[in-house]
Amino acid sequence: MTKRMITICVLAAMLLSCASCGSTETGNDETTKSGGTDTTVGDTTAEPTEYDKYPLPEKDMDGFNLRFCNYDDSWLTWTIKTLDVEEENGDKLNDAVYARNRRVEAKYNCQITEELVANPGNSMSGYIMSGDDLYDIIMVHDEAVSSLYCQGYLDSWDTLEFADTSRSWWDNNANEVFQIGGKQFAAVGDFTLSMVCRGFVMLFNKDMVSDLNLDESLYDMVRDNKWTLDGYASIAKNFVKDLNGDGTMDGNDQYATTGAVKLHFGSLVTGCGVKYISTDSEGVPQFAIPGNTYAFDVFEKIFNIHNGTNIFYNIVKADVHDGSNEATTFFKNKQTAFHGTSMRGVANFRDANFDIGILPYPKYDENQENYYILTSGGTVATIPVTLPEDRHENVGILLDALCRDSQQNLLPTYKEIVLKTKYARDEDSAEMLDIIFGSLTYDLGLSVWPQDTYYKYMESYLKMTDNFSSTTDKIKSIVEKDISDLVSSLDK
């Protein structure tokens, strides 16, 4: 018997034991006799939790196999994709995934399996066109999901009765974006860390910031609603230094930050609450930039902060995507005080020889209520149209069960152990992470059509040309066609 099967058997026995204990009769527990007088113990019943209010059915699935198709390690190395592991290996995240899956398997008498391929989206057409029933859930790169739906390969999530994506163990911010006209074509839940770890944050060198002797710490600026574009700019300019005194700012000098243009400037734009694609009152997407005075104010303010100031060093001038690896080296060499990275990328600085703090990207101004964290580039869950109807119930139950368990166990492991303890080096950064996790922001312009929206605006920052208005005019018809194609597919 394999270690996996032994674990499932032990967990199943424990679950049966707990159920037996829970149903044992205890007689008159609530009433006792004292001197001939009845004394009733006060009601100590706890308030029902969300889990209590929305229970899943108890069901013996008789070995049912929940089949995931996911990416192997040949691509998407920048995100955490793992949905199943064969055994524990001492890594806390690995072991949390293992324990979660074995608990769910034991509870429902089922199996959870994951087949890894180079690109699930690219290989989808062959087996779907032939009608093959190979997978229940296919994990897809967020940028590919609209195209796959428009080609008729994906089903709507309203076909899974028990996978209630409005519950807290699903990512409502993401699922609202992926729901159009009442139909949801992709979903994000706590069973996967892929999108969570793609939230972008701002790291800072605590020693370099401390040397400025600021009147208020960066953490307090976040708490006091003063971490704004103006606040960031006023601090960032102090780090620009011609280290070798040759009168030329280049790779030998010091800056506030550097990196991929799309990451730095995109995070600043999203941090101000700008959305490239919004929805109308009926849930239909619309291109949100044309005629949006606030969006243009944000674009131009960020442009003016950086134009000619050397706050940002454009280390790779070829395109908006490259520069992250070089930026990591600059930050470790103390040539930049700030560094933008995904939460997954925080792990790259375990060996840094200085203390690191973590911040959300700044707000537009103090009137902005919330922080917003750009989130894109991970995988989302999709349902193939080949999924037989008689599998829908079990698939929905098991997905929801995985999300519930992950909310209680996997996500806290990632937040508390992997991030707060292993990488973040102070309690203030741990508090910032709570703000960041609560501020993850999704946008069809970031996740589904970035090539036609988000990246186009980043070209202006790459070239440092203030042409946001002409860019909008140029891409308007393209974006509207993207939206029309997707909406038409949902109506079929």
Regions found by a protein language model. Name each.
Residues D62-N94, C110-E114, I137, T257:
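Short, well-ordered beta-strand elements
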Residues Y149-G152, N173-Y219, T258-E282, S376-P384:
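Periplasmic solute-binding protein
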Residues L229, A233-A236, L268-H321:
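Glycine-centered hinge/linker elements that transmit conformational signals in sensory
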Residues R350-L419:
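Extracytoplasmic/periplasmic substrate-recognition and gating elements
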Residues P412-K492:
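C-terminal capping/gating helix-and-loop segments adjacent to ligand/active sites or protein-protein/ligand interfaces
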